[in-house]
């Protein structure tokens, strides 16, 4: 949950900039494509390879390398949960340092948690939760509070303004 930094490794921003600088044009093109147009086919990596002039194994190796370097954190579908009948909420909690690990573990164990962030603020943990109903959301949050002793501020979404972001990696594509 927390980010460790040392003088030897640099700040997280410096680490990210170094990782981006190490990517070649092909990695950048691959990232551009898989963010918005990952093929839904029996052999998606072969299809990506055809678009990029690579073979299937080269694409797989590049994706694995990007994951190993933590440039790709997750590769999977994103669903519009509201269209599937689910509700979402933003949650905040004031978590004392001595309860941090237990609280984070409890939150992260819930399948509906999509993001979980440590912030420098009185409300130092912020996470998003998706569930089938407001009642189930509240039951999940009550369970976390009961298990950890930390109350949670529940801020249900009332209107969606933006749901996606694409990071353009290759200016030539």
UniProtKB/Swiss-Prot annotation:
Root EC class: lyase
Disulfide feature: none
Keyword terms, alphabetized: Heme biosynthesis, Lyase
InterPro entries: AsnC_trans_reg2 (IPR040523), HTH-Siroheme_Decarb (IPR050684), NirdL-like_HTH (IPR053953), WH-like_DNA-bd_sf (IPR036388), WH_DNA-bd_sf (IPR036390)
Molecular functions per Gene Ontology: lyase activity
Pathway(s) annotated for this protein in UniProt: Porphyrin-containing compound metabolism; protoheme biosynthesis
SUPFAM superfamilies for this protein: Winged helix' DNA-binding domain
Keyword Acetylation: no
Transcription regulation as UniProt keyword: no
E.C. number(s) listed in UniProt: 4.1.1.111
GO terms classed as biological process: heme biosynthetic process
Binding site for substrate: 115, 119
Reactions it catalyzes: siroheme + 2 H(+) = 12,18-didecarboxysiroheme + 2 CO2
Cited function: Involved in siroheme-dependent heme b biosynthesis. Catalyzes the decarboxylation of siroheme into didecarboxysiroheme. Siroheme is decarboxylated to monodecarboxysiroheme, which is in turn decarboxylated to didecarboxysiroheme.
Family per similarity comment: Belongs to the Ahb/Nir family.
Subunit structure: Forms a heterodimer composed of AhbA and AhbB.
Protein's UniProt name: Siroheme decarboxylase alpha subunit
Species of the source: Desulfovibrio desulfuricans (strain ATCC 27774 / DSM 6949 / MB)
Phylogenetic placement of the source organism: Bacteria, Pseudomonadati, Thermodesulfobacteriota, Desulfovibrionia, Desulfovibrionales
């Amino acid at each position: 949950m927390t980010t460790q930094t040392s003088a030897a490794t640099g700040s997280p921003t410096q680490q990210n900039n170094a990782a981006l600088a190490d990517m070649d044009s092909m990695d950048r093109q691959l990232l551009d494509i898989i963010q918005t147009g990952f093929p839904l086919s029996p052999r998606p990596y072969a299809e990506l390879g055809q678009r990029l002039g690579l073979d299937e194994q080269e694409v797989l190796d590049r994706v694995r390398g990007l994951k190993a370097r933590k440039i790709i954190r997750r590769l999977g579908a994103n669903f519009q949960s509201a269209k599937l009948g689910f509700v979402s909420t933003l949650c905040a909690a004031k978590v004392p340092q001595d309860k941090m690990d237990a609280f984070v573990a409890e939150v992260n164990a819930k399948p509906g948690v999509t993001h979980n962030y440590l912030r420098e603020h009185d409300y130092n943990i912020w996470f998003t939760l998706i569930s089938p109903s407001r009642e189930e959301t509240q039951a999940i949050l009550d369970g976390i509070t009961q298990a950890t002793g930390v109350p949670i501020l529940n801020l249900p979404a009332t209107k969606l303004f933006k749901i996606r972001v694409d990071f353009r990696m290759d200016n030539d594509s």
